[in-house]
Amino acid sequence: MTGDDADETHENVVPGSDEDLDTPDVRGYDFSGEFDFFELLDSYATTGFQASHLADAVDITREMREDDATIYLTLTSNIVSSGLREVVAHLVRENYVDVIITTSGSLTEDIIKTAKPFKMGEWDVDEAALREEGINRLGNIFVPSDRYVWLEEYLYDFFEEFFADQKVRTPTAFARELGATLDDEDSILKNAADNDIPVFCPALTDAEIGNFLYYYRQGYDSEVGIEILDDYDALIEEGLLADTTGLICVGAGVPKHHAIMTNLFRGGADYAVYISTGMEGDGSLSGAPPEEAVSWGKIKDEDAEPNYALIEAEATLVFPLLVAGAFENP
């Protein structure tokens, strides 16, 4: 190989560039000085990868608040299964969010935890043995079956009062009136009821609440029912009456889609933050990034600056950091 040939191959291996990128240097947090938690969070902006996405999400959530946006918080039931329940309850107690959209499992587990705790368990266990012992597994969280025995009794008493004057009620009325019966400062439903924050639950039957409603209808009163269209109207109105809307979607599924779909009626949400481990490649709603919602008109696309962010991470790791950075940073 001649010297000229070597020069050509070198150019392939180490291509030259005269460009000076006008972007920040990649740099992480300096632990050598006095530790500052919020400076650590700020350093995520130049850390790269998902840390920088988290920093973007913090900035966008701060903008929601500065813009006095109507903030929607959507969450799946596993969020309430975990210790994130207390994080969500804090947001609701402090009136940091205006609308909650969630699943029936979230309501179920919030109610149970007002009386009986969930317990830390393990991922790798003998499932058949757990079944024999009356223990249900949610990842590495254990839920003894006696929790559901207690829940059934509690709900039957509630059903009698709830359906006494009206046979057909909405999920938001269900959540509000049920929350008013609870006595636990860490309850999402109690704090929502106290602060008049609506809790929308479009799939109210998709958990033990649905099971117990079935048995109540079979054994006590076949005329009771749940009306979801009135709630859908009300959810659309939340967006239409708002000057600005912002979405914080923790997980996906029905809650996330109800938030973005009802914002379509107003021309799209102004801000959106997603936390998700969903995979875009399967074409599912759960894996769809904010950009896909832009194509449907469910989220606005602001050319001037980013108005949405996706953190591809498991929520128990990053949601508390988002809350700290966006709501608690002085």
Swiss-Prot record:
<comment type="function">
    <text>Catalyzes the NAD-dependent oxidative cleavage of spermidine and the subsequent transfer of the butylamine moiety of spermidine to the epsilon-amino group of a specific lysine residue of the eIF-5A precursor protein to form the intermediate deoxyhypusine residue.</text>
</comment>
<keyword id="KW-0808">Transferase</keyword>
<feature type="region of interest" description="Disordered">
    <location>
        <begin position="1"/>
        <end position="25"/>
    </location>
</feature>
<dbReference type="InterPro" id="IPR029035">
    <property type="entry name" value="DHS-like_NAD/FAD-binding_dom"/>
</dbReference>
<dbReference type="InterPro" id="IPR002773">
    <property type="entry name" value="Deoxyhypusine_synthase"/>
</dbReference>
<dbReference type="InterPro" id="IPR022899">
    <property type="entry name" value="Deoxyhypus_synthase_arc"/>
</dbReference>
<dbReference type="GO" id="GO:0034038">
    <property type="term" value="F:deoxyhypusine synthase activity"/>
</dbReference>
<comment type="similarity">
    <text>Belongs to the deoxyhypusine synthase family.</text>
</comment>
<dbReference type="InterPro" id="IPR036982">
    <property type="entry name" value="Deoxyhypusine_synthase_sf"/>
</dbReference>
<dbReference type="Pfam" id="PF01916">
    <property type="entry name" value="DS"/>
</dbReference>
<protein>
    <recommendedName>
        <fullName>Probable deoxyhypusine synthase</fullName>
        <ecNumber>2.5.1.46</ecNumber>
    </recommendedName>
</protein>
<dbReference type="GO" id="GO:0005737">
    <property type="term" value="C:cytoplasm"/>
</dbReference>
<keyword id="KW-0386">Hypusine biosynthesis</keyword>
<feature type="active site" description="Nucleophile">
    <location>
        <position position="298"/>
    </location>
</feature>
<dbReference type="GO" id="GO:0008216">
    <property type="term" value="P:spermidine metabolic process"/>
</dbReference>
<comment type="pathway">
    <text>Protein modification; eIF5A hypusination.</text>
</comment>
<keyword id="KW-0520">NAD</keyword>
